[in-house]
């Protein structure tokens, strides 16, 4: 009984090893230098050369200034987006969290939208954007 269990355990270990080894991509399989040299399909001359350029202090300062300008312009753009005028409210409208099935009028809150679920059987006005 112990011999059969030992054989089954050995077989299981070999199957696990074979499964893992067979699923490795070709790049990860172990190879020696001879096979890499002879079977290499990728030629190192095909890749473009890399040139390293040292930056001087002026170029670093210019890039910092440009980065600061971009940051300030992004902040100004975000401030402009916040100050959008709100649309005037229409008289017949649906309050937030109430039913707004398609024959009903639009939601009262300009930041809210009508959200339907269960094949448009349950619809309600919900605020989806917090910073509207």
Swiss-Prot record:
In the UniProt record, does the keyword Glycoprotein occur? yes
- Region of interest called Disordered, as start-end residue ranges on this chain: 62-88
Organism of origin: Semnopithecus entellus
InterPro entries, per this entry? Agouti, Agouti_dom, Agouti_dom_sf
Query: Which Pfam families has this protein been placed in?
Result: Agouti
Recorded GO molecular functions are: melanocortin receptor binding; neuropeptide hormone activity
GO cellular component terms? extracellular space
Give the residue range of the signal peptide: 1-22
Name of the gene: ASIP
Q: Compositional bias of type Basic and acidic residues: which residue ranges? A: 63-79
- Provide the protein name: Agouti-signaling protein
| Physiological role | Involved in the regulation of melanogenesis. The binding of ASP to MC1R precludes alpha-MSH initiated signaling and thus blocks production of cAMP, leading to a down-regulation of eumelanogenesis (brown/black pigment) and thus increasing synthesis of pheomelanin (yellow/red pigment).
Keywords (A to Z) from UniProt = Disulfide bond, Glycoprotein, Knottin, Secreted, Signal
* One GO biological process term: melanin biosynthetic process
Task: Cite the Agouti domain residue spans from the record.
Answer: 93-132
Where is this protein found?
Secreted
